[in-house]
Amino acid sequence: YTIKRQGDSYNDTDIRSEYASATALRGNLKADNISKYIPVKAGLILSSNTNYIYPDDITEALFTRLLGILFASSYDKNVFIENVMRYPDVNKEIAGRLYKSAMDMITRTVPQGAESKDNGAFSFGSLCEHIKTKEVPLSRIKRALVRITLGLDKKHMEKYANEPYIRVLGFDKKGQEYLSYIRKTVEVPLITKIADYKEMLLDDIHAANIYNMIVAGKYGVKEFGDFVRGPVRV
């Protein structure tokens, strides 16, 4: 049986009770107003890392990607639609709206409904709102745009379904002993050294590089790439 949700509703954007929605927590993160609604340890982790990025921070990466697809499509609407429909969650209607938005971006024309609240320009969030319809929920639009930004089309998704792997992010002394044991029995690659599995992890590395570039541009902080960052030992 299902457990009845307590506190705020799933999509609530405001915090009204001691059990806030994830949507509200993310929305209030900027204002540093969530410490009393999350576990103490989680609060300590958040307070020790202030290099946050938000959906609108990937706007430039998204539109650079869309511009690349336009170029590859010779700016032809039908070819563009065919190309972006290769990505999961993108149907013909979404693809058509994306084409118009991408062309408007080139001519610096912001379609009604896609203005940013900050400066009237395009943003990831405002574009999602512009593209969504009654039949296509906002969550689907966001997934589609992130996949386009990362270049993860349907072929990539099929590859991950058929080629699973385990990437170890961290372990303690006991975990190290366990890893030594399961390495002999596990049927999929158990990855602790990224350089040994470069081809398999290219998409992970690409996504991490986009993140690192955004952080560097926003905060002037250079993040270490996945090739030089090993599992965390605790």
Write out the residue ranges for each language-model feature.
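Active-site cores that bind ATP or allylic diphosphates and position pyrophosphate for catalysis
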Residues: 1-234
